[in-house]
Amino acid sequence: MQKVNRTLWQRIKPWFITLVVVLIYLWAFSGIDMSSIKETAGEVTMAILNGLFHPDWDFVYIGDGEDLINALVETLAIAFLGTFISAFLTIPFAFLAAHTKRGFSAHATIGKFLLTVIRVFPEIVLALMFIKAVGPGAYAGVLAVSVHSIGMLGKLFGESIEDIDRGPNEAIVAAGGSAVDSWTLATIPAVLPAFMNYTLYRFEIAVRSASILGIVGAGGIGAPLIFALQTRNWSRVGIILLGIIVMVTVIDYLSGQIRKRLV
Amino acid sequence: MNATLPERDFAQKWHLKALFAIILVAIIIAGSVQKVGIETEFSWDQFFQIWKEMAHPDWSYFPVIVQPILETVQMALVGTLFGTLLAIPFSLMASTNIMKNKFVLSVVRFFLNIVRAVPDMLLAAVFVAIVGIGPMAGVGALTVFSFGMISKLFYEAVETIDEGPVEALTAAGANSVQTIIFAVIPQVTNQFLSYFLYTLEINVRASTVLGYLGAGGVGLYLDQTLSMFLYDRTAIVILGILAVVVVVDGISNHLREALA
């Protein structure tokens, strides 16, 4: 039987990779102080679970605008407006970042870098900046969501512009159409379903981020949650968590159904 | 000429569906504007003041945030590992081709849907309340967050495997544990590793802000500099976050391409 000859590197490669992974994890675990857990951890966990199973139903609707329904509707309004505005703001960025011609493209490189920066810029910091400009409240949340969403939507929109069939554009130019004709009659109809699909997808994510923006005072359900956690009002925490879970699940389901029909 | 045109009924001719959708969106927008209350003046002075200060980063602050940024990466690594280890059994229980018991399957999937519905920052807030301020809270939040995400990615991968090896092993008399180890795992290892790295990227991004709530990492410095209005230092923190995210994404993308 002939033995397969393997180079030294091929033989030690799996061991080398294992060693690197083990070293990385030894380093990672060394940075986390496991002993720092509070002694009350078990107690608090039980209290939160107890709160989840015995939620404060009275908080659902009070009628003075300080209840769960009101905060959830505000969260949805922030996510919806933010995503809607963002979809329009994104379009120029998407065309800037789309790499539609062969070879190096300066505008696509700049556009893609710009979108990465926007994507990584923490949404909470954006929210705080807008709070400076318009004061605390849901309006600041809307602005933060609409600027932050450009990062991801621009990437997805740009990729769908890159993916379209160029045939119709060339046909319109060949038949004597201007660049504007080629844009409005060929590009826009081709990318519109993808744009709508991604906007809905981004709306699902925006609902999640809008529910945390309240932590810094940018409106929505986050503020009552943090307040309830700080005052150790576990049944209040329970009902708010339940409310968020139901809201996110329903929105994901509805948006998923609409997106299925779009494709 | 008219005869060659396709017949369209009333609803199609007047685009009733599209019209209905547009009116619905318009109503929701009007309602949202009402709710959010966009009548406040936008103060460009205040807004640009922050940018002006951030445009001159305080580089002397950089050494202070190196350690917290590394802690952020450590939290992401440990959280992703714990989340993945938890996700493996659950993803097998949520795959239609492994779990034949419909009841268990739907219970597990329902549970996973609930876990996935909780945003990462809320998990951090809850874990800070449970284990106290520090990186352990971040690890806990990231564990639960990546558990929810990875479980779904994993069970979708398991459901697309080739059933041939599974049937062959079952026919040869293997029990279900042996089938999973020798027929399922080898087929999905590369996809699992790729999804692990993808989740790690998302966790690094998430862990940079978790500290804002006291859950460890560089986010704490975001909170401190912002609340003291030291925007030249905030700029350094943001640049640090940008750098670590770009580096981790780059390494992870490179490895995932090698795995594919």
Model-predicted regions and their roles:
Chain A
Residues 83-91, 95, 99, 124, ...:
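Hydrophobic positions within alpha-helical transmembrane segments of bacterial inner-membrane proteins
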Residues 136-187, 193-202, 253:
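Membrane-cytosol interface at the C-terminal ends of specific transmembrane alpha-helices
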Residues 207-244, 263:
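Glycine-rich helix-loop "coupling/hinge" segments at transmembrane-helix boundaries
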